[in-house]
Design a protein with these regions (language model features):
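Charged, low-complexity intrinsically disordered terminal segments
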Residues: 1-329
């Protein structure tokens, strides 16, 4: 997990973990040291060790790695057969037990079977990278693309790369956008698209696809929110519709294509997710999950304000300044 903080959610989780450890279950935990900075006590790793959790911090401040590359993934895998992933971290605001920014809108997906093992393998690889002394159990190699339930699922894992290069994350998202025939819906807490994403959205609009972007109405990071708003005008001019969630903060990272194909994961539409972070996601096509996400977007739109030209920022100089800093936020 990228963020972990003591609170009601973690207390409930750790009680279950203690019970499972007592029954002989091995528990491994990997947290990002930057994401958890100032959220956990210094003796957290010792506390976890004392209850039997094998816990490591990813790319700590004392490591020789460039700590600006963060492990932004949120994954929980059970027995290598069930995986949970999405936007939810292990902190109370993510499940509505603490309201810092109004209503917290988040989401994720549960997957079972062979695709879940891909996430188990990914976790073990990152855990081994962070720990010289502890190794995860070996996971059998499997193909990435599998039948899950009533649809087709594909696991996605993204690593940092150089700004200016088209990344795997971008290629997957652009591929979905280019497949769209009728409608694209995207929810993201931060909308700071680079040229490749903007060009893909432009192509979609040019062929008559309706594009809707859902972003927070209440910001958790004011500067990043201002940068997001700086992209409103050019998107509206393309014919893209932008909706702000008036009741609070959208943290879900979902893409829905033609009410059929979905991408759910940890990937924001911004430079950090595309170029700086380790991220993950899953593409699911023609499944019950697609229909559930379509219903969720419909409900979300009812709680949103549609952005009109009169709502756009007026200061062009401010927009230019904010855009300059977009790649490093």
């Amino acid at each position: 997990f990228y963020i972990l903080e003591y609170g009601k959610l973690f207390d409930e989780l750790i009680e279950v973990v203690k019970e499972k450890i007592a029954n002989g279950v091995e528990v491994f935990m990997l947290i990002d040291e930057i994401g958890t900075l100032n959220r956990l006590p210094k003796n957290f790793l010792t506390d976890m060790k004392n209850i039997g959790v094998k816990c490591q911090k990813f790319q700590g401040l004392t490591s020789g790695l460039l700590h600006n590359n963060r492990d932004h993934r949120k994954i929980a895998v059970v027995d290598g057969d069930v995986a949970f992933l999405g936007g939810v971290n292990l902190a109370d605001e993510y499940v509505g037990k603490k309201q810092k920014y109004g209503i917290w809108k988040d989401g994720g997906v549960r997957i079972e079977g062979e695709v879940a093992r891909d996430f188990a393998k990914s976790f073990c690889a990152m855990f081994s990278l962070s720990s010289k002394n502890i190794r995860c159990p070996k996971i059998d190699e499997d193909k990435c693309e599998k039948i899950v339930g009533d649809g087709l699922a594909k696991s996605l894992f993204f690593t940092p790369s150089c700004v200016g290069e088209k990344t795997k994350a971008e290629c997957e998202i652009i591929g979905l956008i280019d497949e769209a025939k009728t409608e694209i819906k995207i929810s993201t807490p931060y909308f700071i698209p680079d040229d490749d994403i903007q060009e893909a959205l432009q192509r979609a609009c040019d062929r008559g696809v309706r594009v809707k972007i859902f972003v927070p109405g209440i910001a958790d990071k004011k500067l990043v929110n201002l940068v997001t708003k700086s992209y409103y005008q050019c998107q509206l001019e393309r014919g893209i519709e932008i909706f702000e969630f008036e009741k609070g903060f959208i943290h879900s990272k979902n893409i829905l294509i033609d009410d059929s194909s979905i991408l759910v994961g940890t990937i924001n539409i911004d430079y950090r997710s595309f170029f700086r972070n380790f991220e993950c996601g899953v593409i699911v096509k023609n499944s019950r999950a697609s229909r559930q996400l379509a219903d969720d977007f419909s409900e979300l739109e009812k709680s949103c304000k549609k952005i009109e030209p009169k709502d756009l920022p007026k200061t062009r100089l401010l927009i230019k300044i904010l855009r300059f800093f977009a790649p490093i936020l």
